[in-house]
């Protein structure tokens, strides 16, 4: 039986690097992987998955209205897919996560999703919430806070390094916009003096 996997972490934990390594492992054994990433995350260019250490691979892009199962079936019809790998899975909709579960259940293709668990305010992303609810296997990828503790949260900052406490849930950025922290230091950073 194929499974739906969700590997989550805070920013800068190496999620994309791990995805690209897993894809390489499949390909090295003569297997075909299908890579997907969110259209709105174009930090390394649209239609690419890239890591901070310089690894890159082409990927199909999805948006909120992409029919994931139809895209995967079409790709599978052209060349049998041995594993589907989704980067930036936090940007999936609830409906799209259910579709990915059907790919695993009906097509018997493993689906590996990688993404953030929570946003800069500590709220679950919709895609992550559904993955946490229905994935067969859930894995935490660890990174560290500046204090050495496990980082589980992220803060958003402006160009001057000032922590932003309110705003849209989705704003694309990398190391210049987001910092991974342990919960204690996240709470301290988010405290506006009233806490």
What are the functions of these language-model segments?
Residues 87-89, 115-116:
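Walker B catalytic acidic pair
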Residues 104-126:
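Sensor-1/coupling segment of RecA-like P-loop NTPase cores
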